[in-house]
Amino acid sequence: MSLNQKITKAVALWPKDELRPWLSFPKTLDTSIRARLQKMPPQQANKQLNALNNLLDNVYWNKYIPKQVVLKPQFKPSYYESLTQIRRKEEKAPLWKRLFKRK
C-alpha cells in the first residue's frame, strides 16, 4: 500500500467531532500530514503513520489511562455529556429555530 493510500485510510477512519461539526479535523489532518510525510524519509514517515494509527486504535488511551478527574471535572461531573446532549438537541431543532436563536 502506498503512502498516500495509508494516509487516506487513516484520515477516513478519524472520528468526527460531535461538539464542533463545522470543524473538519480530518480534512486539516489530511492536508498537513500529507505535506509533512512527503518530505520525510520512508522509514520515518511509516513511524509517523503508525503513531497516527495508534491514536485511532486508542493504544495511547489504554496505555496511559486518564484519571476520572480529567474525564469528570469536579465542578460539574456531567459536563461533557451535557455538552453532547445540548448539541444533539440543537441539531434536531427546526431550521427556523436554529437561525433565529438568541445568543
Swiss-Prot record:
It comes from the Eukaryota. InterPro entries: Cbp6. It is found in: Mitochondrion. GO terms for molecular function: ribosome binding. It holds the Pfam family UQCC2_CBP6. The keyword Mitochondrion applies. One of its GO terms (biological process) is mitochondrial respiratory chain complex III assembly. GO terms for cellular component: Cbp3p-Cbp6 complex; mitochondrial matrix; mitochondrion. Keywords: Mitochondrion, mRNA processing. Involved in processing of the 5' terminus and the intervening sequences of cytochrome b pre-mRNA. This is Cytochrome B pre-mRNA-processing protein 6.
